[in-house]
């Protein structure tokens, strides 16, 4: 099972990724984790990545792809892998294809943006304990204060509506085009590569966690 999980920020990808990993016994591959591990291990690719990072520059797509290829040689990838947050752009997807990285499924978790804004902007946190609440789905007993201590709750900057909307704008401009890219490849094929086209699946990310998990597993049969 080799797959890419797509969806907007707040669509619930992280929760469903954990279910997929457990069911199929595959690792979740995050480029951020890969970069940190390679830098820590001092591998040639890690040292190259460190030069970019120390200079405050973005690591090149070519280097990321080489890290991906190196990571896929590890024994835990024998039964497959789950890409999390990669590729983010069409050039990265093209580079993966040219590098011969095989993908069986591209799974999109689709949630309307107004629902995502409600989900994310409604989060509240008690800083000292890390306890989390939601003004709509899991409200505190008394509005704005922690159930245990009575101390005030905060809204993280990342959860403010303005920030959420900016993240969704970036998703629309950079990552959403990947959906069309993979859908077209799945439907029409691509004579420029010997790789089999992945199957593209879209599921609704609305409903309970268990309902969405059932849809995910149905889509991957």
Curated annotation (Swiss-Prot):
Compartments where found: Cytoplasm
A GO-annotated cellular component: cytoplasm
UniProt-listed CDD domains: ADK
Binding site for ATP: 10-15, 123, 132-133, 207
Record's keyword terms, sorted: ATP-binding, Cytoplasm, Kinase, Nucleotide biosynthesis, Nucleotide-binding, Transferase
GO molecular function: adenylate kinase activity; ATP binding
Region (NMP) location: 30-59
UniProt cross-references to Pfam families, sorted A to Z: ADK, ADK_lid
Positions with a binding annotation for AMP: 31, 36, 57-59, 85-88, 92, 156, 167
EC number annotated for this UniProt entry: 2.7.4.3
HAMAP family (alphabetical): Adenylate_kinase_Adk (MF_00235)
Assembly with partners or alone: Monomer.
UniProt record similarity statement: Belongs to the adenylate kinase family.
Domain remarks in the Swiss-Prot or TrEMBL record: Consists of three domains, a large central CORE domain and two small peripheral domains, NMPbind and LID, which undergo movements during catalysis. The LID domain closes over the site of phosphoryl transfer upon ATP binding. Assembling and dissambling the active center during each catalytic cycle provides an effective means to prevent ATP hydrolysis.
Name by which UniProt lists this protein: Adenylate kinase
Organism: Paraburkholderia phymatum (strain DSM 17167 / CIP 108236 / LMG 21445 / STM815) (Burkholderia phymatum)
């Amino acid at each position: 099972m080799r797959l890419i999980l797509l969806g907007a920020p707040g669509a619930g990808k992280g929760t469903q990724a954990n279910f997929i990993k457990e069911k199929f016994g595959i690792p979740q591959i995050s480029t951020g984790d890969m970069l940190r591990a390679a830098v820590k291990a001092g591998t040639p690719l890690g040292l190259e990545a460190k030069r970019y990072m120390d200079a405050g520059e973005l690591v090149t797509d070519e280097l990321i792809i080489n890290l991906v290829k190196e990571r896929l040689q590890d024994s835990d990838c024998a039964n497959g892998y789950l890409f999390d947050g990669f590729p983010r752009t069409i050039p990265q997807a093209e580079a993966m294809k040219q590098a011969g990285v095989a993908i069986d499924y591209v799974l999109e978790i689709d949630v309307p943006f107004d629902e995502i804004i409600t989900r994310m902007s409604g989060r509240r946190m008690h800083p000292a304990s890390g306890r989390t609440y939601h003004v709509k789905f899991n409200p505190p007993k008394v509005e704005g204060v922690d159930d245990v201590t009575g101390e005030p709750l905060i809204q993280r900057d990342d959860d403010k509506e303005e920030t959420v909307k900016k993240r969704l704008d970036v998703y629309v401009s950079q990552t959403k085009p990947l959906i069309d890219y993979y859908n077209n490849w799945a439907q029409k094929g691509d004579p420029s590569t010997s790789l089999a086209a992945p199957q593209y699946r879209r599921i609704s990310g609305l409903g309970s966690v268990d309902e969405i998990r059932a849809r995910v597993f149905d889509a991957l049969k």
